[in-house]
C-alpha cells in the first residue's frame, strides 16, 4: 500500500525526471491555475461520492484529490514539512 509520503516522493521524482508522456508532468506544465481547477473538481467529486456512493468510490475520489493536492504542492515548491507545520 502506498503512503502519502510514498506518493509525494514518487511525484517529486517524476517532476525532476520529467518522463515523456507523464500525466503528472503535463499537469505541472499546466501551472497552478490548471492544477487548482483539478483540486476543486476532485473536491466536489469527493463530496458527491461521500454523500451518494459507496465507501470504495469515496476512497477512490479521496485518493485522486490527494494526488492533485500533492501536484499543487510540488508546483508551488512546498514540502510535506511545510504543510505539516500547519497540521
Curated annotation (Swiss-Prot):
The cross-references to Pfam families, in alphabetical order and at most eight, read: PRA-PH (PF01503)
Q: Which GO terms describe its cellular component?
A: cytoplasm
Q: Which InterPro entries match?
A: HisE, PRib-ATP_PPHydrolase-like
User: What is its subcellular localisation?
Assistant: Cytoplasm
Keyword entries, A-Z = Amino-acid biosynthesis, ATP-binding, Cytoplasm, Histidine biosynthesis, Hydrolase, Nucleotide-binding
Please indicate if the UniProt record lists Lipid biosynthesis as a keyword: no
Is Nucleotide-binding given among the entry's keywords? yes
Known EC number: 3.6.1.31
Protein's GO biological process: L-histidine biosynthetic process
Query: What protein family is recorded?
Result: Belongs to the PRA-PH family.
Q: Which HAMAP family match?
A: HisE (MF_01020)
Q: What is this protein called?
A: Phosphoribosyl-ATP pyrophosphatase
Amino acid at each position: 500500500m502506498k503512503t502519502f509520503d510514498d506518493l509525494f516522493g514518487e511525484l517529486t521524482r517524476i517532476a525532476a525526471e520529467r518522463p515523456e508522456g507523464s500525466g503528472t508532468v503535463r499537469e505541472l506544465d499546466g501551472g497552478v491555475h490548471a492544477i487548482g481547477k483539478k483540486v476543486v473538481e476532485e473536491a466536489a467529486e469527493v463530496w458527491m461520492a461521500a454523500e451518494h456512493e459507496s465507501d470504495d468510490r469515496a476512497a477512490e475520489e479521496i485518493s485522486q484529490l490527494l494526488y492533485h493536492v500533492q501536484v499543487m504542492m510540488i508546483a508551488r515548491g512546498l514540502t510535506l514539512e511545510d504543510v505539516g507545520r500547519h497540521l
